[in-house]
């Protein structure tokens, strides 16, 4: 393993030192067993270099801080830039305690990928202490194929071009809640996409016997033999009922009173 360069703060000046891999192992051996030591260091080195996040000042108005409870604070805090669709680390705060004081002090005095490496180590140590898997790649996802095996080629929609069942449904566009989404099927063999099949009525309702004959397509519209609803009477005129009175202009002569 390569040397890890750490910069630590003192009361007077900032000093920098190179900490070899053996020193990191000696530090981690205080918290974890030797059996988990190599895997933890390798995982932290890989993830810290892969998921390194930039540091910026929280001066923009469009940045929302993600709040963590103190019990869930593992030393990694993020803020979201809603305008640029990026994530940044902002104002890192580490709950220092006596158990991880040495490692927390090293995190406070570092920056860049070295800081990320130590933060991942702190996260992995806490997970090992609690008996939880820290590497998300080793966590097995729940398989729902027995319940929702929608990608089985046996039941897939066949491609109209090459008749292959190696197809995948895709939602192209989502619409309002009262409208169906735009769905297309893509064929992995011929690289063509096609519209999904539509449902058609395949049963014929016999009005006389009230029996359903399956697998017979409806070819004509059934007559509506139900009695028609009663005709509603015309509404009375509001003028006839005296609801609306005749109006006169102010220049007109007032109407004469009936004697």
Swiss-Prot record:
Q: Where in the cell is it found?
A: Virion; Host cytoplasm
Entry binding sites for Zn(2+)? 159, 162, 187, 190
What switches on expression, per the entry, is described as:
Expressed in the early phase of the viral replicative cycle.
The family annotation for this protein states: Belongs to the poxviridae DNA-directed RNA polymerase 30 kDa subunit family.
Class of enzymatic activity (EC top level): transferase
The record's GO molecular-function terms, alphabetically, read: DNA binding; DNA-directed RNA polymerase activity; zinc ion binding
The organism encoding this protein is Vaccinia virus (strain Copenhagen) (VACV)
The name under which this protein is listed is DNA-directed RNA polymerase 30 kDa polypeptide
Q: Which residues form a coiled coil?
A: none
Biased composition annotated in UniProt, kind: Pro residues: 226-236
Zinc finger spans (TFIIS-type)? 155-195
Q: Which reaction does it catalyse?
A: RNA(n) + a ribonucleoside 5'-triphosphate = RNA(n+1) + diphosphate
**What keywords sit in the KW lines?**
DNA-directed RNA polymerase, Early protein, Host cytoplasm, Metal-binding, Nucleotidyltransferase, Transcription, Transferase, Virion, Zinc, Zinc-finger
Give the GO terms filed under biological process for this record.
Answer: DNA-templated transcription
* Purpose of the protein: Part of the DNA-dependent RNA polymerase which catalyzes the transcription of viral DNA into RNA using the four ribonucleoside triphosphates as substrates. Responsible for the transcription of early, intermediate and late genes. DNA-dependent RNA polymerase associates with the early transcription factor (ETF), itself composed of OPG118 and OPG134, thereby allowing the early genes transcription. Late transcription, and probably also intermediate transcription, require newly synthesized RNA polymerase.
- PROSITE patterns given for it? ZF_TFIIS_1 (PS00466), ZF_TFIIS_2 (PS51133)
Pfam entry (one): rpo30_N
A cellular component annotation (GO) from this entry:
virion component
Give each disulfide bond as a residue pair: none
Q: What is its main location?
A: virion
Q: Subunit details for this protein? A: The DNA-dependent RNA polymerase (vRNAP) consists of eight subunits encoded by early viral genes and termed according to their apparent molecular masses Rpo147, Rpo132, Rpo35, Rpo30, Rpo22, Rpo19, Rpo18, and Rpo7. The same holoenzyme, with the addition of the transcription-specificity factor RAP94, is used for early gene expression.
Q: Where is this region: Disordered?
A: 220-259
* EC number(s) given by UniProt: 2.7.7.6
């Amino acid at each position: 393993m390569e040397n890890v360069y750490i910069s630590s703060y003192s009361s007077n000046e900032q000093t920098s030192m190179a900490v070899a891999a053996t020193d990191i192992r000696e530090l981690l051996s205080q918290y974890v067993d030797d059996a988990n030591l190599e895997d933890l260091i390798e995982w932290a080195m890989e993830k810290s270099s892969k998921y390194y996040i930039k540091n910026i000042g929280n001066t923009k108005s469009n940045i929302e801080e993600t709040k963590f409870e103190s019990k869930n604070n593992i030393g990694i805090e993020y803020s979201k830039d809603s305008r640029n669709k990026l994530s940044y680390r902002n104002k890192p705060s580490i709950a220092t305690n006596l158990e991880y004081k040495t490692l927390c002090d090293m995190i406070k005095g570092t920056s860049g990928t070295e800081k990320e490496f130590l933060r991942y180590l702190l996260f992995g140590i806490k997970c090992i202490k609690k008996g939880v898997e820290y590497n998300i790649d080793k966590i097995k996802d729940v398989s729902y194929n027995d319940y929702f095996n929608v990608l089985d080629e046996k039941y897939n929609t066949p491609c109209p071009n090459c008749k292959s069942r190696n197809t995948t449904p895709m939602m192209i566009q989502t619409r309002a809640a009262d409208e169906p989404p735009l769905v297309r099927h893509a064929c992995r063999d011929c690289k063509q996409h096609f519209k999904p099949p539509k449902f058609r009525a395949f049963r014929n309702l016999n009005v006389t016997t009230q029996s359903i004959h399956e697998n017979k397509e409806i070819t004509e519209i059934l007559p509506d033999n139900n009695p028609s609803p009663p005709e509603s009477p015309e509404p009375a005129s509001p003028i006839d009922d005296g609801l609306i009175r005749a109006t006169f202009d102010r220049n007109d002569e007032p109407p004469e009173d009936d004697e």
